[in-house]
Amino acid sequence: MAFWAGGSPSVVDYFPSEDFYRCGYCKNESGSRSNGMWAHSMTVQDYQDLIDRGWRRSGKYVYKPVMNQTCCPQYTIRCRPLQFQPSKSHKKVLKKMLKFLAKGEVPKGSCEDEPMDSTMDDAVAGDFALINKLDIQCDLKTLSDDIKESLESEGKNSKKEEPQELLQSQDFVGEKLGSGEPSHSVKVHTVPKPGKGADLSKPPCRKAKEIRKERKRLKLMQQNPAGELEGFQAQGHPPSLFPPKAKSNQPKSLEDLIFESLPENASHKLEVRVVRSSPPSSQFKATLLESYQVYKRYQMVIHKNPPDTPTESQFTRFLCSSPLEAETPPNGPDCGYGSFHQQYWLDGKIIAVGVIDILPNCVSSVYLYYDPDYSFLSLGVYSALREIAFTRQLHEKTSQLSYYYMGFYIHSCPKMKYKGQYRPSDLLCPETYVWVPIEQCLPSLENSKYCRFNQDPEAVDEDRSTEPDRLQVFHKRAIMPYGVYKKQQKDPSEEAAVLQYASLVGQKCSERMLLFRN
């Protein structure tokens, strides 16, 4: 079990589906079905592997729809940010934000927004009802201590390194796309410094960011004339930050549209801050009440919830609690891996919050809520575009982090179909767990709610459970392979549940994660 050295393993309680529940998408009272597990703790790599098998978390509850039985099959969807080009409607939203910030312009007429997974609470309500019925009573501290003792008894050092200093120094990390300068908070839009005018015979006005890059490049050239490129790469700046001069007719990039300079007398100032939500950073704690008030108004106005709901504890349970262990490896993103809130601050107050997970291969969007007074800004679309840009920023240092997961795509649900407009994107095949371009999937979904997207009839799940006896079980304060555990069990339903769990999480996760059994 060397894979646990230096860190804690994932610990989960598995609960197989026993019934159908109300569907939050089509409102069928007994149409939704999913299997779930309560994650006491989970490594970011395990969760990455799980979402690549169709799982998804809500708080600490991780669930996987029974795709061929549930009324609204939910297909994991991911966007490829490195090839992403904003559509006309996306550009319209970004320009609308710029006009509002620059001149305070408010568009006329109503605006239909696209909040990420706006029906998530309803969609998993049945699953949470199941968890409540089971009356889970587990002392997490005791469980953690038991695991630690078990690991130590096997000669493994399970002491977890707490990146306390890094977490404190990175309570919030401002987005600084294309900037190599360390900063804790960076304004989304900066006032341009005085430069050359609009006279066409003179060079165009340059952004301060570009000027800083040029100065840094010249300085490195003086220090190492023969190796300026290597100098930038050594400092973590990939060559992509310094592309060849674009042709005048080349369309603007996503970053150009988001970070377009504002006039000196701009009406509003927008900042985006990324704060770690689990374990909660000091900045997260300091803004928790304000963030909750935004969520409460969002639920009351957008989802018509009564004023006494949701409570702060419900908010914390769904959107702040996370099983993901914070990790800050040297080759990872500066903010580390784990669960975060991406806060949108307008003139010093929070107007929207995107709940995200930063994982080894992707940024995963969990939820978005916003102040209904700013619905006219299409914050659902705007935040998705910002998260795509954020993924591209993280990719510059961590090359394998190159995807943006948008949760589930439900072809039969109009509220969820918009996710397919962020192209290029892929859907996960529910049988072989390979990614298939969405264009190839849509014709099949027009004919049937449930589809196998992989067209190769011989293809199988490459990570299917082939050696269930190697599955790791945590039972009576001891860690053991399932092959040992099953000799102590006489209940056939227990074996069926464990084997089902193994088939759903796959061989790799079954050998790494600890399945908690009473």
Curated annotation (Swiss-Prot):
- Pfam family for this entry, one: ATE_N
Q: Locate the Phosphoserine modifications and list their residues.
A: S169
The reaction(s) annotated as catalysed by this protein in its Swiss-Prot or TrEMBL entry are: an N-terminal L-alpha-aminoacyl-[protein] + L-arginyl-tRNA(Arg) = an N-terminal L-arginyl-L-aminoacyl-[protein] + tRNA(Arg) + H(+)
> Which key words are in the record?
Acyltransferase, Cytoplasm, Nucleus, Phosphoprotein, Transferase, Ubl conjugation pathway
Question: Which GO BP terms sit in this record?
Answer: proteasomal protein catabolic process; protein arginylation; response to oxidative stress; ubiquitin-dependent protein catabolic process
The terms describing its cellular component in GO are: cytoplasm; nucleus
State what protein this is by name.
Arginyl-tRNA--protein transferase 1
Q: Segment Disordered: which positions?
A: 175-203
Q: Does the keyword Phosphoprotein apply?
A: yes
Xref: InterPro entries: Acyl_CoA_acyltransferase, Arg-tRNA-P_Trfase_1_euk, N-end_Aminoacyl_Trfase, N-end_Aminoacyl_Trfase_C, N-end_Aminoacyl_Trfase_N
UniProt keyword Acyltransferase present: yes
